[in-house]
Amino acid sequence: FLKKPIDTFYQRRLQVRFEAVEEDDTDNENFDLNGLDRWRLDNELIQEGVVKAASEEELHERLEATLDRMARRGDLGMGVTEHRLRTELAGRLPDLFQRYRGALTEWPEAVAEPLPFECRYSDSTGAVEVVDLIDNLRCNPSGQLCRLVIANAGLLTGSGYSKKVRYANLLRDWLIHLAGQLSGQPFETVILGKEEGRKFHFPVMAPEQAQKHFEAILGRWMEATTRTLPIHCEAGFAWITSFYGGKKFIGDHERAISEAEQAYSTALDRDTGYLLGAFESPEALMASGEFEALLHQLYVPLWEAEQGKSAAEQIGSME
């Protein structure tokens, strides 16, 4: 829902699913990985190598064995292509392995059992009960808890100094983090990015603050099954990072709107039908005036946790 709020109404209420149509390229038979294949192989290498290896030597042995298995399955193509993909897939894993081992040193003891979570919420739209188990928990010698995970997807986009955080790929772990603060055993969250040297951290929160954010998400999720909410993830974070984190453009409302509209226009270009069916233009998305209220409810708390700062204080510091 948080990643694709507009899709929720179509899929849950109308039972409509638009599928992306891929055209066969009959003139070009060069082997390469699509995004989903690369994600699958990436995570197989991480689970079989980074997570299970106890030393650098064992890491390289495990990576080679896993890559050989992928090659036998035909996942890596042949010849020069296979060599290139082996290098691309395994190249950044030694850095990730070192960071993972460092985190294990800080949080040495794995929690044997997952942490149960249960939450009931109701409003004028209806009622919902959320029940789940939270895993990947570890503790330090002081008994403090941490959920330590390696990111499933890339957490940065762009290159060089223009790199930006892909907040959409932090949403799942953020939601689990909020839930954990309500479990009676609050924990911090550490997410190791696949990108070199990158780590994201969510600190322990006051239960009442986490409950406010969690219930706001549940309430909007239920509402999203009754109508298309005028909010879009990438557009929302484009507004937030411009208005609250735009350095020399901080507090510039017109620029924030422009950044959000540009992000939504980009999303429309690759839309399979959901966005065009609901809000066919950036102007249509903004027309009701709800966009900014929704992004403050659904997305600003994540930005604040990742940045370690208050959005309101960012604006207050200018006064």
Segments predicted by a language model, with ranges:
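Structural signature of nuclease core domains in nucleic-acid processing machines
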Residues: 1-319
